[in-house]
Amino acid sequence: MLLSDGNDNDYNDIEIADGLKKLTKGFNLSFTLHTFGYGEDYDPKIMSRLANLRDGSFYMIEQLDKVQDYFINALGGCMSVIYNEAKLKIKTLKNNVKIKKIFGMDKLYNYNLKDDYFETTLLQYISGKEYTFTIEVELPNVISINDNLFEVEFIGGEDNQKFNQICQYKIVGGAFSVADEEYLKSKVYDTIDIALKLKEENKNDEMNKKLNEMKNWINKNYEGINKNKYLKKINETLGLFQDNYIFESRGRSKITADIYENQLRRGGNFVYSNHMQCAMINQSKTNSGRSAPNPIPYFCNK
């Protein structure tokens, strides 16, 4: 766990990440790196890139009294690992079905993507944590809803105690579903990620155009209350971009943390999702006189 309250003014995020990658190459170690940015003077690009490198979480800490809560969330997760280096594999079962994009793919520890195949490694698969992958696929004009189109395989554990599960999936149609909202969320944060890069390159007109195009796309393709929170998020992001002082002091860090947590969902950075995390945060808050959160329903992986 790495906490920083200092800035790297030389913008060496890629060099630092590459250095850590070379340092750990050849070590037969399964470890996750969690990074914590505190205050206003630290570099969120470096902190998030280092976390991405080892499949960890990047935490933006805005209040001092939240530091122990974030550390507990990360530490409780490290103490609740079910599998080291679990693998997720997705392949298409039809020649004319293609995998076009995995949202947030650049934030994965590793991946292999082809038209008909996707594979990634989860360095530490944590009890109670939900992993959500949003995938954009290309389908033919005519397709049967009864056809199995994808096969998903999850592999975890050592060779002598390997857990292996294979599921096949069809197209699901109908009313607005969880999948629709996940796709909308992924599209929004993918756009915010692009807009952040444009802002850092001082391409403000292109940045504004990109975000406003996304607002128009949402209004055109989505109806009802579900879209409002994403329109609000885009407007909040535009507000953080407009004032350079706000952007430099906290906007960049907040936007980076939002992108990291939502573009590729790995359970959330501030969600106590298993018994260990709940017990540790309850004990911490009892000792400090703060109110403890309600226990979260927890289902043990059999």
Predicted regions and their residues:
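Catalytic P-loop NTPase motifs of RecA-like helicase/translocase cores
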Residues: 10
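A generic structural signal for short
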Residues: 35-36, 184
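Active-site metal-binding loops of divalent metal-dependent hydrolases
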Residues: 5-6
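Acidic, polar loop-rich interaction surfaces within structured domains
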Residues: 14-32, 38-159
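A short alpha/beta connector and helix-capping loop motif
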Residues: 1-2
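Long, acidic serine/threonine- and proline-rich intrinsically disordered regions
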Residues: 139-302
